[in-house]
Amino acid sequence: MAKQIQAIRGMNDILPNQSPVWQKLEAVLRDAVAAFGYSEIRTPIVESTDLFKRSIGEVTDIVEKEMYTFEDRNGDSLTLRPEGTASTVRAGNEHGLLYNQEQRLWYTGPMFRHERPQKGRYRQFHQFGVEVYGIASADIDAEVLMLSNMLWQKLGLTEHVVLEINTLGDSDERAAYRDALIAFLEVHKDKLDEDSQRRMYSNPLRVLDTKNPEIQAILADAPALMDYLGEESKSHFSTLRELLDAVGIQYRVNPRLVRGLDYYNRTVFEWVTDSLGAQGTVLAGGRYDGLVGQLGGKDTPAVGFAMGLERIVLLLETLELAKDVPAAVDVYVTAMGDSCVPAAFAIANELRVALPGVRIMTHCGGGNFKKQIKRADKSGAALALIIGDNELAEGKVAIKPLRNDNEQQLVAREALAETIKALI
């Protein structure tokens, strides 16, 4: 027997019994962005490697260790996208969507990072993101946080996530702070772990994000970024907090919060949860006013966020919030004998036209009554329709409830759609 081919490590199938919770999540995401008037953008999975080197930064873990990069037959270096923001900016620049315009966009799709697979984190993962361009004021920062908050409300996760916010200031303020932080870290260099020493000069703000408790203790005495902010950055952050207070979104200021990508400035935020064990991030983002210019466009203010859908699915399943996801089938149509199959197909088609949104499956493959009802029950359908010679002769169809103890009933064919509508 030929050797069975397996999926690549860290790249998982989403099987039919798993799809309903994904479909529920995706429907919530689409409803939320529609409620805020955002437009969808779709970009290629494969991009020029330079796009991510210029946006994410060459000395980040993503570019150095995690990207899937290869040369095509023309010798061009290409990369499977590790995140969605850079591709969205590239598309906006290329098609003239960003300069002197306001754009509220969203995207979803697979991303790729070669990191150690673990529960909720995979080498191919699905990301949902929101990006807004052309608005520099703090009110749009508040809006994207309102949108993210709506997602938790619709998913029943509000009590299980916490919003953390911080400000990184502008590039000049951050540069001054960077110098002060490096000077502080140099004093304690011998006590830093290998990862912090590696980042100390290339990306010192990332040292603040360490999970090492010994380094965290050292950083307790580090200079505070807030002390290096000018009035404009302080005012921006203050306005954001006022707007969050006004709409009742609770948050905590985390002065150690930085983002893993180099392009962020001013507002940064994360929604975190401890419902998956150790505290973990389930949604993150912030403002990145310099990235559009960095990638060849005109300087354009921008803010956005992204979330990994595998983490959200895991959270829903862990909290047992995925149990109310409906079955894939509402009505299962059976035929008692080959002579009834044409009528069963015709009735199923009539119902699909009369009841849009109701999921109707027709039994195929023959079999006796017991086998067909067993299949109907296994499908998860609420109702089985029984099409038999005697019923057809009377112009009727039998409806058998499968999820309660209600009795089977005979219904005239012309009243079938309305009866089903009332029952499911």
Curated annotation (Swiss-Prot):
NCBIfam families: hisS. Pfam families: HGTP_anticodon, tRNA-synt_His. The lineage of its organism: Bacteria, Pseudomonadati, Pseudomonadota, Gammaproteobacteria, Alteromonadales. Belongs to the class-II aminoacyl-tRNA synthetase family. The keyword Nucleotide-binding applies. GO terms for biological process: histidyl-tRNA aminoacylation. The keyword Nuclease does not apply. Its EC number is 6.1.1.21. InterPro entries: aa-tRNA-synth_II (IPR006195), aa-tRNA-synth_II/BPL/LPL (IPR045864), Anticodon-bd (IPR004154), Anticodon-bd_dom_sf (IPR036621), His-tRNA-ligase (IPR015807), HisRS-like_core (IPR041715), HisRS/HisZ (IPR004516), HisRS_anticodon (IPR033656). Homodimer. It is an enzyme of class 6 (ligase). One of its GO terms (cellular component) is cytoplasm. It catalyses: tRNA(His) + L-histidine + ATP = L-histidyl-tRNA(His) + AMP + diphosphate + H(+). It is found in: Cytoplasm. Keywords: Aminoacyl-tRNA synthetase, ATP-binding, Cytoplasm, Ligase, Nucleotide-binding, Protein biosynthesis. PANTHER family: HISTIDINE--TRNA LIGASE, MITOCHONDRIAL-RELATED, HISTIDYL-TRNA SYNTHETASE. This is Histidine--tRNA ligase. It comes from Shewanella amazonensis (strain ATCC BAA-1098 / SB2B). GO terms for molecular function: ATP binding; histidine-tRNA ligase activity.
